Swiss-Prot record:
Protein name, as recorded: L-rhamnose mutarotase
Main location: cytoplasm
Lineage: Bacteria, Pseudomonadati, Bacteroidota, Flavobacteriia, Flavobacteriales
Active site: 25 (proton donor)
Gene3D superfamilies per record: 3.30.70.100
């Protein structure tokens, strides 16, 4: 994806649910991965700090990516509901995230 915007953020999995988090992502719904791709997200990875439960997400976003459109999609909300019992979430069940500032990049 040319002119992709790199995006990094943290989330948190609840203590004791690290394995379940991995299982659910190993079984991610194909229609959700399609939605993410169609929305302009590619090259998406999530890493886990096993000591703290902090999840580090990194993704590339197309220049036309619209987070509000994805956030309001019923399938995205269904996924958030599915994950809400094992993650720190906002009142709407979206994961609590902390955006990270890029301080170095090497291609």
């Amino acid at each position: 994806m040319e002119n992709a915007i790199r995006n990094a953020f943290t989330m948190k999995v609840k203590s004791g649910f690290e394995t379940e988090y991995k299982i659910r992502h190993d079984q991610i719904w194909p229609e959700l991965t399609a939605l993410l791709s169609e929305s302009g997200i590619c090259d998406y990875s999530i890493f886990l700090d096993e000591e703290t439960g902090i999840l580090f997400g990194v993704q590339k976003l197309s220049s036309g990516f619209d987070r509000s459109q994805l956030s309001s999609h019923p399938l995205m909300r269904k996924w958030w509901n599915h994950m809400s019992d094992i993650m720190e979430t906002n009142p709407d069940n979206s994961p609590k995230t902390n955006s990270l500032k890029e301080v170095f990049h090497l291609d």
